[in-house]
């Protein structure tokens, strides 16, 4: 069960968890005659589909016999210094003295399938990371049909939901709406997180502003399909979920195989949205970004696209670089139109050879001339795209 997440507190918080006899809320067989223990009303760390919780669940498995029930029970836990990593996935990283990892192992006693809940705690940043992995310890093939990387259940509170919607050339528009009964969802099925919704959600108390008030953030460390959901149940309790998009998701796990879910960054503050942003910024800058530009100032660049679109020569680009240099700009990026027969956006994609006739010189010669000005040179390429009107397609 989930107990508390919020402002740092001293002492035992068990008093927050109260048990009620909720009429027609199912009770586990193990509870015997105790009708106050219901998965449909108690806050959880990993809610499961098919065990009596009729809210949206974090985990949905299809067992070897075709059944869809799942009942993860506590098995053991481990606390260690340092931050866990995720095979093949981006994740927050930290030195051993900057973070601790909590691993909680759950097991379905009927199937032997395990779920490990991973928590990375970075106390100096007010950051907790969450992830889940599912290990098939049964003897049969199973399918993971849904797995949310993070879940927060709130017994009390009246919240607003903040999300960021958008479209091409108008991304990341703030929307703030009250959390109402039922479900409110954001997500993407485009193969990327996309410009339609940012894979992030904020729950804020009603009076929260930029500088004051309590607010919780979930931010997905993943750029593929995603799903975020906030729901209020019949008891005015709120559940917040974020993870991989469940639509058309059906991941097979043979016996002994493991599925690792992408990571979610969580943060809480009682000092308003600005402090929440600072927490996330510090985490991303110092514990996600890598390479030389983690600490170095990135170069300022001028891009040829809005300056010239497809209409340029080597000389006009060189003149653009000279003007850029006079303004203290560090780099010229040659955008679309330098390759093949690419004079509009209906042809040439896929023919990745330099159009020297258009440039009036070799690309290498142009790069050298620009570099001699003390300006770096970058180039645009979109290798996943192809035009029907191209030599490659023909």
PLM regions and their residue ranges:
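Polysaccharide-binding surfaces and accessory modules of carbohydrate-active proteins
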Residues: 2-231, 247
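Short Pro-Gly-centered flexible turn/kink motifs
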Residues: 70-74, 251-270
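Terminal connector regions
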Residues: 122, 266-299
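Glycine-rich, histidine-containing beta strand-loop boundary motifs that form or position
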Residues: 132, 145-148, 263, 336, ...
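Carboxylate/His-rich catalytic cores and anion/metal-binding grooves
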Residues: 259, 263-266, 270-271, 370-381
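Aromatic-lined carbohydrate-binding/catalytic grooves of carbohydrate-active enzymes
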Residues: 293-394
């Amino acid at each position: 069960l989930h107990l508390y997440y919020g402002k740092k507190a001293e002492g035992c918080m068990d008093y927050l968890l109260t048990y009620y006899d909720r009429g027609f809320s199912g009770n586990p067989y193990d509870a015997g005659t105790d009708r106050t223990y219901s998965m449909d009303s108690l806050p959880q760390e990993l809610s499961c589909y098919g065990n009596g919780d009729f809210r949206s669940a974090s985990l949905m498995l299809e067992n070897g016999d075709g059944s869809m029930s799942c009942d993860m029970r506590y098995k053991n836990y481990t606390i260690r210094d340092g931050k866990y990593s995720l095979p093949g996935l981006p994740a927050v990283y930290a030195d051993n003295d900057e973070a601790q990892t909590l691993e909680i192992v759950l097991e379905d006693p009927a199937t032997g399938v395990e779920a490990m809940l991973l928590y990375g705690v970075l106390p100096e940043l007010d950051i907790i990371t969450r992830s889940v992995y599912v290990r098939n310890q049964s003897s049969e093939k199973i399918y993971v049909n849904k797995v949310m990387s993070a879940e927060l259940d709130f017994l009390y509170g009246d919240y607003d939901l903040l999300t960021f919607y958008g479209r091409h050339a108008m991304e990341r528009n703030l929307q703030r709406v009250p959390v109402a009964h039922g479900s409110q969802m954001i997500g993407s099925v485009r193969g990327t997180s996309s410009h339609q919704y940012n894979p992030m959600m904020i729950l804020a108390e009603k009076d929260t502003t930029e500088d004051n008030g309590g607010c919780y953030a979930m931010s997905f460390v993943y750029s593929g399909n995603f799903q975020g959901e906030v729901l209020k149940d019949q008891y005015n309790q709120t559940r917040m979920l974020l993870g991989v998009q469940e639509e058309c998701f059906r991941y097979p796990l043979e016996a002994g195989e493991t599925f690792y879910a992408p990571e979610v960054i969580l943060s809480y503050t009682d000092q308003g949205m600005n402090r929440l942003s600072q927490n996330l910024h510090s985490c991303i800058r110092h514990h996600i970004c890598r390479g030389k530009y983690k600490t170095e100032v990135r170069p300022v660049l001028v891009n040829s696209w809005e300056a010239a679109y497809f209409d340029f020569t080597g000389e006009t680009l060189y003149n653009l670089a000279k003007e850029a240099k006079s303004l203290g700009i560090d780099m010229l990026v040659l955008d679309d139109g330098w390759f093949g027969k690419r004079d509009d956006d209906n042809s040439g994609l896929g023919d990745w050879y330099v159009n020297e006739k258009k440039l009036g010189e070799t690309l290498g010669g142009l790069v050298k001339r620009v570099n001699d000005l003390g300006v770096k040179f970058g180039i645009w390429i979109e290798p996943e795209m192809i035009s029907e009107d191209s030599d490659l397609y023909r």
